UniProtKB/Swiss-Prot annotation:
Cellular component, GO, one term: receptor complex
Cellular compartments annotated: Membrane
Record's protein name: Receptor tyrosine-protein kinase erbB-3
Gene name as annotated: ERBB3
Region called Disordered, residue ranges: 1037-1081, 1093-1193
Residues linked to a glycan: 126, 250, 353, 408, 414, 437, 469, 522, 566, 616
Organism per entry: Pongo abelii (Sumatran orangutan)
Amino acid sequence: MRANDALQVLGLLFSLARGSEVGNSQAVCPGTLNGLSVTGDAENQYQTLYKLYERCEVVMGNLEIVLTGHNADLSFLQWIREVTGYVLVAMNEFSTLPLPNLRVVRGTQVYDGKFAIFVMLNYNTNSSHALRQLRLTQLTEILSGGVYIEKNDKLCHMDTIDWRDIVRDRDAEIVVKDNGKSCPPCHEVCKGRCWGSGPEDCQTLTKTICAPQCNGHCFGPNPNQCCHDECAGGCSGPQDTDCFACRHFNDSGACVPRCPQPLVYNKLTFQLEPNPHTKYQYGGVCVASCPHNFVVDQTSCVRACPPDKMEVDKNGLKMCEPCGGLCPKACEGTGSGSRFQTVDSSNIDGFVNCTKILGNLDFLITGLNGDPWHKIPALDPEKLNVFQTVREITGYLNIQSWPPHMHNFSVFSNLTTIGGRSLYNRGFSLLIMKNLNVTSLGFRSLKEISAGRIYISANRQLCYHHSLNWTKVLRGPTEERLDIKHNRPRRDCVAEGKVCDPLCSSGGCWGPGPGQCLSCRNYSRGGVCVTHCNFLNGEPREFAHEAECFSCHPECQPMEGTATCNGSGSDTCAQCAHFRDGPHCVSSCPHGVLGAKGPIYKYPDVQNECRPCHENCTQGCKGPELQDCLGQTLVLIGKTHLTMALTVIAGLVVIFMMLGGTFLYWRGRRIQNKRAMRRYLERGESIEPLDPSEKANKVLARIFKETELKKLKVLGSGVFGTVHKGVWIPEGESIKIPVCIKVIEDKSGRQSFQAVTDHMLAIGSLDHAHIVRLLGLCPGSSLQLVTQYLPLGSLLDHVRQHRGALGPQLLLNWGVQIAKGMYYLEEHGMVHRNLAARNVLLKSPSQVQVADFGVADLLPPDDKQLLYSEAKTPIKWMALESIHFGKYTHQSDVWSYGVTVWELMTFGAEPYAGLRLAEVPDLLEKGERLAQPQICTIDVYMVMVKCWMIDENIRPTFKELANEFTRMARDPPRYLVIKRESGPGIAPGPEPHGLTNKKLEEVELEPELDLDLDLEAEEDNLATTTLGSALSLPVGTLNRPRGSQSLLSPSSGYMPMNQGNLGESCQESTVSGSNEQCPRPVSLYPMPRGCLASESSEGHVTHSEAELQEKVSMCRSRSRSRSPRPRGDSAYHSQRHSLLTPVTPLSPPGLEEEDVNGYVMPDTHLKGTPSSREGTLSSVGLSSVLGTEEEDEDEEYEYMNRRRRHSPPHPPRPSSLEELGYEYMDVGSDLSASLGSTQSCPLHPVPIMPNAGTTPDEDYEYMNRQRGGGGPGGDYAAMGACPASEQGYEEMRAFQGPGHQAPHVHYARLKTLRSLEATDSAFDNPDYWHSRLFPKANAQRT
């Protein structure tokens, strides 16, 4: 580092030697564009940074600091005040980035397409070296782009910065995450906003503290402390010279919107003239001259001219000027010294857009006809047109072969010069020979052959060359330079009329017509000879200069009988077409044209002459006086103060009357529209039956005409069609009703929707509070289904946007309402097929409705085929039988319902995120299911798991799901645990209220439809107190650690459910007395003895607030018959019994548990108990929990036979509510001991709080739970299986194979299946759903 110190000292001395240059102007340095790519090691990278940015103030480009070591001294960066591009800091090891003076990052270039500041991976995994602090204390403006700061293990105080005060673009993305954790707090004077822990590290706020009158930054909170509009990054005063940085350009310390222009308006000459004080834009600075390696393009300094301009030198200034056509392009020719000997198909494309040929052009027979020896194909004659752009050939032109159908060389019609710097053979610069079909030369623009001889011979059809005066073309002596022979004789050409046009002069011509003349006899216009110009008539009017016709200026008025102009300028017109400004004809008078002292404004008088406005007019005028100024208040002269006051009062009265009348008219129209909307939305139509014997159905839907519907915009698209937002304009009405229009098309084209089918009428007859009612349908080539427009959108978007404002009460009620809506569809025989959170809409924040039901049945069967390649196919929501066999039933909808509830409980997470659609069925076959959401207890999660059972017959029905979620919704904190995270300085408060009634009214307004859907309370007769109370229920939340969260995979969205080892280790730790929480995976199979864990968990969901006594579920294998199992078998009834167990109402009589929209209220009795508020189990009497022997005999359980046993003694009352908590079901531990046990163990109930008011009809929790040990326990009890010696269940013996059966065991329905083979697949045939292969051939049914 001594060498580095020496270099820094030398650099400092050099900077001091520059003296005033550094002090009086900004030190500008170039940036880099390397990204994360670097050359050399860290030492080389440091030296490069030092050379680029030492004493630099403005970085013209990007500031990239990558792979710099921990001992690098970066103090030389402290002078940087502005970066025009982006700032990249990545993979460094230094502790502090010293940019204390950086104020503005302009973001003219952004990293990764969207970030102006990108800071990432600044740490060393093998040491403690890492970036710990960004010293950007003066940064107050990012003009374009966002911020990305991630994965910096030691970087602190990034989340204490108000980035919205710095970033100008409100839509810019700001990502700040995964940085330092153990950081000191901000100093108290910083008020929570700082770059570091010291008092000098406070963030400077320049936007959020400003008064509303300020458009941008400010230097104080008062209205008179706003910064100038051209300021960026703050200011110290209101002037444009007080800015810390400029928004656009800095002109000698003043911030201006543009630099002084190169042309200004001269009021004396009425012309734009060069500005002696012009400056050019160089980055964000106005400079008097561009750097030597830049060129001037209009008002800017650029590195190179754009494609349509060329670089020229004017008075020592390099400038870009328009090319006036093709820009000059030089191309290499053919012949000696070149890579090519002739023009052929291999090099013809290299002459595109060439204006100058450096060398020669040879056209030989091997080029046109091809060269088989070199495998060069024949040349396409049409490609010879590329030479239309050639103006000069520096060498010679040699044409010895030409396409037979081309009779001239008009492809060289723009050729003006043949240089002759290199000559062919005996000194020829133009050689044309043996072209048998050529009749004329066609070199109409050729003016000069600088050197060399001309050889034209053996062209049997060539004429017109006899007339040429070659002395006008050849430069220098002409003696012995012409060798023209053996062409067509002159007399033959004259005899056939192949002579020059009469308009040609005596100089001759290159071919027929007035456009081939070497010179004209009279006038020429655009290279064509004419008899006269359009002096007095014709369009456009012209003047002549050196016998060539030119058009007058467009602003000249065409004259009759006299000349319109005498030159090309606007000051040469005899009369102006529009206005005259001084001597010049203009299209309009100057309006805001920049002059030497500011903008110039003029107005036209009666003669259309432009006259200057009054000097105080700033926005134009219509006359010369002050009162003629535009945008200014007229001064009333001669009016008394009394008259003025009366006029003002009268005007105010008229205005108020007009406003009052307008309001009353608007209110009347509003009420009228509201009533009309209700009439149309609530009224149905009766469809007459086709068969007179049938009874007419009340169909709520209408049959629309296409003229009544108007689509406004596309809301989205799905598997079966596209959804539009639109309006319904009833025929004969003027109201516009907002609706959703779903367009369904048959992609195969085999079906049209001209006829109204029974299924369409069935959909239209459905009406329920929790389904979106079909307003009508419009048949045609594509079917249009019309529903009411719900502006709150889908439930999926709502939970994602308001996840911090959703409580357990609302989530569980949504589950109830979706289940009720689906149960209504089930009662009416309607299978949804596409149930998901995106297809559930919000009518209000407390009421949801199921949408898009019955759509799939409108399409032909082939259109319902599922393709994994289709991204819109809802594979992740579909049941396995639907994926594999296309089987859709109400029970397949139950599977989708479970996924939908999972979406709600994860606040809109994507199921199976990161998996391709084709991988999902294989994953489900292996027994994997979606992971338990963090907010769900095992009760809620097991309801989801039951919805995902492979056998559709043992899934719950929607009626049972509605009852189950209704029961949970009466005590929400018991089943959902939502943690409220508090930010810095924010205390945790009660559950947010969501959208207020006022916001709901604003959401329902449709300004583009001129429609207001809200009326006063006496018009609506709808109370809004229900919604308010539902959203403002004070629900307690639990902040408890969850021991099972280590198994969740947030990246993938599902939980692996076959981790048997975890369960075994958990059991071992439980037996050994450890209270440490173990993860408990949920696996459907494989499990011991061929039993599915999902089967063993059927019916084992906690069903009431008083469930305390646990039942250990014994899993067993069940062989099924080949036919589908009826819904009335024992297992099914046992499951239904557990789900339909009535809940004893605890609320006082007379209190409603649901509102008019089906919103379930929390049980007031439960909410009155402390345990309920804390989310623990309800306190009940012990006798109520244990029950009596008679009650035990009447209870029926699934997959187990329970013996009667005596009630254990009363447990002690817990000392505090902290001893109570949620418990997870242990389904991952080894069950082999319990399955083979013949003894019983007493079940130890969790300590409870007695409550004499609880009824004894309570369900049970199916959990394996042990009494806590003496050590400190966690919030969740460790639930391991009971030892084999203590199981309280009957002996369950394994089924032996043939010849090994126990004599006393008989099974009437037992059918032995074949053993499992390696080639078997779970879905080889549809019979899989009604049978199962056991791992062992001698497995016994239990």
